[in-house]
Amino acid sequence: YEMTSSLVGSEMCIRDRLPAVFHVSARALASHALSIFGDHQDVMACRQTGFALLASGSVQEAQDLAAVAHLSAIKSSIPFLHFFDGFRTSHEIQKIEALDEEELKNMVSKKSLKAFRDRALNPDAPVTRGTAQNGDVYFQAVESRNNYYNAVPDIVARYMGEISEMTGREYRPFTYYGAADAENIIVAMGSVTETIKETIDYLAKKGRKYGLVTVHLYRPFAEKYFLKVLPKTVKRIAVLDRTKEPGALGEPLYLDVKALFQGQSNSPLIIGGRYGLSSKDTTPAQIVAVYDNLELNEPKNDFTIGIVDDVTFKSLSIKSEVSIVKPGTTECKFYGLGSDGTVGANKNTIKIIGSHTQKYCQAYFDYDSKKSGGYTCSHLRFGDKPIKAPYLSLI
């Protein structure tokens, strides 16, 4: 609620095309009950505001794409909402590579920055903004902004390319991971994409070819960049949404992908599913279930993973859990009670390991919404290879 009301109160960012950037840890909206935990409901409630929406899937991406958001906002004069998964990404401790601030300064469009500053309110050059308009001109004024939004995907792609060149980490509005000739793929955004990538590698060793299209630039949704990375061999697509829109024919990302192929000949079969509401854990076995569902003669649409739905029977059945943690990775669990110091001690431990050794590290802390006295579980991983496992330890 707080984020949606804040954006509604920031309509002048849209009105005046101010290059504001909101960095948001996406969380659940209150419905039948309040939840403080993470999903994409609050972000999806803001998709009609006019803000450009940029999604990150890991701690490293959150840093890198934060820079892309600021650079693109200045260049495009469009405000950006850069979001990442609440708790799963916002509260995770990871060892990352920091960006060089001097290099970032050189990427800023000086011309666009000057133009923004020149538009500052000045009593010596008064202007009128935020007027009330009647029906004779309002519609035309709304449509006149189209060109600014049409330019955003190319601007974002440009800065993603510059960040990629600087870091060696590939960024595009949409990225593809998996077999070049995959027939069955998933489309998703957020931290679940890291789990999907690891699952694709696990299944590839068993001779199964799958793929993933990761959505980074969600708004404006750029058709040309999506189709550019989509393999020509794709026949079936499962779109995963981390939100629930009661009464709709489908969830937002699913409907966007469906609309993209509307009217095209030989378009792939597209199904949609939900996962991860209120930080519900999404494990490799659940991703395997999504790919298994795509293999069926009649795949289930409007499905859920991560729960057993014995009321409306939409959930996919999950086989035994699979462990895909890389060899050499150590996993630890520490149980405690809220305010007993267990979480704080483990935060210090993982920071010491990350700072004073060559090990990669990851820490995530699972707890309920009570204050002191509630259940806590600290999940620590460290190893010799990068750790891409945004789910609770399975040991």
Locate each region found by the language model.
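Single conserved hydrophobic/aromatic residue that forms the stacking wall/gate
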Residues: 1-9, 14
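Conformationally flexible catalytic loops at phosphate/diphosphate-handling active centers
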Residues: 80-176
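A structural-propensity feature for long, helix-poor, extended segments
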Residues: 33-51, 226-245, 365-395
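Terminal amphipathic helices with adjacent charged low-complexity linkers/tails
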Residues: 85-124, 228-265, 271
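Anionic-ligand anchoring segments at beta-strand to alpha-helix junctions in alpha/beta enzyme folds, i.e.
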Residues: 166, 180-181, 187-216, 328-394
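Glycine-/acidic-rich phosphate or pyrophosphate-binding loops and their flanking alpha/beta elements
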Residues: 161-184, 316-329
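Peripheral docking tails and interdomain loops at the edges
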Residues: 236-325
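Conserved thiamine diphosphate
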Residues: 34-86, 110, 263-276
